[in-house]
């Protein structure tokens, strides 16, 4: 069990307003995505649509500017038809469709990959629902669930994004009672990664804010 953290005075009021609590809670039950049930053979879809930041990519990936969207959509459709249960291919088809302005068509594919606990898909579809990017429907409460789960599966963007969004009140109205100790564990795990400059700055900022919330000087 982790110790309960006393949040007093102004910090206590902030916690109530942000929907952040500090109960006695179990340590985060970290999960790991297992890609072994799915083919790891490189496909044309991987060549055209892998994301550089996807931890489960099988090639270095392409930025959105480097992608030929028509080609990516075509080859990913073909490859997914050959391997319909592969969450990596589902995600990459969804990525291509989203960039092409076809987010309504993309969402079922990325939701399918998220349901299979593909970390990149969980974070990205959560982000889409949070921001309404590419004209996707806004659903901040669903976003909270997905981004948190991506953090539990170790996705760096989720490990840093979820605490930041919670502390900034982005999930307000969702009935979320985020555990401060969980948020600290997310940030701590992210800190152990090989961070580039901007993520490292965000880690430092989040650590300061969490200490303030906990009343630790």
Language-model regions, residue ranges each:
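Terminal, low-structured helical/coil segments at or just beyond the last alpha-helical repeat
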Residues: 30-37, 41-44, 173-217
